[in-house]
């Protein structure tokens, strides 16, 4: 079973997966300004290649990714025993897919265009979870 325990002395690390560099860098800047370390990826595949062994507080994933979709990534994570909290970013037209993803283990979804406050509140809630709830 994959582990996702956050070391108690480590700053929270959030993964952001978005194919749009403006959106990806905007989320990184927003979270970084608020004391969160961020690793960014342009695809699910690049995340899977680079993230082996990283301790993530949560993942923020665009639902529509090139190659493997956000939903496919979620399924892959869950089937491998990794229950890192996943927040999906979904356009209004993708809300029904995002709701289906919640049934498959997504923690939440945020509709795009999103407000910074909504993202910060969700990340804050996830990185402050007790260790037992945040572990894989």
Which residue stretches match the model-derived regions?
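C-terminal output helix
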Residues: 94-96, 110, 114-124
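Acidic catalytic/metal-coordinating carboxylates
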Residues: 43, 69-72
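Active-site residues of response regulator receiver
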Residues: 61-63, 90
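Short amphipathic alpha-helix used as the core "switch/output" element in two-component signaling
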Residues: 71-82, 100
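His-Asp phosphorelay/catalytic-motif detector in bacterial-type signaling
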Residues: 11, 55-57, 79-85
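Non-catalytic signal-transmission and effector/linker regions of two-component phosphorelay proteins
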Residues: 1-28, 43, 127-128, 132-136
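Acidic, metal-coordinating helix/loop segments flanking the phosphotransfer/catalytic sites
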Residues: 40-58
